[in-house]
């Protein structure tokens, strides 16, 4: 409701109003009345909490509307910036709960030193956390469901620890271990390079140094350009 069109024939209207009148603008694959993506720019001055999002099936079992799959694209980072993505060793749900309890859960997570242009795809169920010193674009399925696993024992202004969702997260986590969670890709001058493709979004990166045409109008859904 707070996003207002600034030019063209819809100038002055909210995005919600425009989409209510013209749901076809979102294409044929979107649920009517629901903008399908959240796109955030996150500038982390300190480490954010370790968390996980359930997939659609797990979310419904847990009483949520839908799950959340997302991705990160690093825009900038400090020299010592790090993040967590996925498990680096096999653990069971009971071991996970014990590691949350004793504060050692980070020992089970794959930690990455990151730099500009790094990409991480985060399917629902993958444990993750953004460390301090990261400025990134987060593209995600529209959903508010987040299960906080660990918050480094920080307290709020009232001296209370933030709520953790240990049991819900145990049900949502994908305990599969992979060798590498960073997306490997090679930029190509003035051409699209696909860096993520899932049921909820497809993301490509362009490395542009000359005029380039992007055929957005030929697609069967909307296109968001981040420059």
Feature roles, as predicted:
Residues 43-45, 78, 132, 199, ...:
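A generic beta-sheet turn/junction motif
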Residues 70-72, 129-153:
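A short hydrophobic beta-strand segment most commonly corresponding to one strand
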Residues 39-40, 48, 70-73, 111-112, ...:
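His/acidic/aromatic-lined binding-pocket segments of jelly-roll/cupin-type domains
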Residues 76-116, 121:
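Intrinsically disordered, low-complexity linker/loop segments enriched in Gly/Pro
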Residues 1-91, 151-179, 203:
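Transition-metal
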Residues 59-61, 127-132, 137-140, 206, ...:
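Short beta-strand His + acidic residue motifs that chelate non-heme Fe in jelly-roll/DSBH
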Residues 50-53, 113-132, 139-141, 226-227:
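Conserved metal-binding segment of the jelly-roll/cupin
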Residues 147-222:
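C-terminal amphipathic alpha-helical segment
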């Amino acid at each position: 409701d707070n996003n207002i069109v600034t030019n063209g024939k819809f100038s002055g209207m909210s995005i919600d109003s425009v989409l209510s009148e013209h749901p076809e603008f979102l294409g044929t694959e979107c649920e009517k009345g629901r903008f399908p993506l959240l796109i955030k720019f996150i500038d982390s001055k300190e480490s954010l909490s370790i968390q996980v999002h359930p997939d659609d099936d797990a979310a419904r079992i847990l009483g949520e509307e839908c799950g959340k799959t997302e991705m990160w694209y690093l825009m900038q980072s400090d020299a010592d910036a790090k993040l967590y993505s996925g498990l680096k060793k096999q653990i069971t749900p009971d071991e996970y709960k014990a590691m949350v309890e004793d504060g050692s859960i980070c020992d089970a997570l794959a930690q990455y030193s990151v730099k500009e242009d790094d990409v991480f795809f985060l399917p629902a169920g993958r444990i993750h956390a953004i460390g301090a010193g990261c400025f990134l674009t987060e593209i995600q399925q529209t959903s508010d469901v987040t299960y906080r696993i660990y918050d480094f024992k920080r307290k709020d202004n009232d001296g209370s620890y933030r709520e953790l969702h240990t049991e819900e997260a145990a049900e949502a986590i994908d305990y599969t271990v992979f060798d590498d969670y960073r997306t490997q890709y090679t930029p190509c001058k003035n051409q699209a390079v696909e860096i993520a493709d899932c049921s909820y979004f497809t993301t490509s990166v362009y490395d542009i140094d000359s005029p380039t045409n992007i055929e957005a109008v030929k697609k069967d859904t909307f296109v968001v350009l981040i420059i």
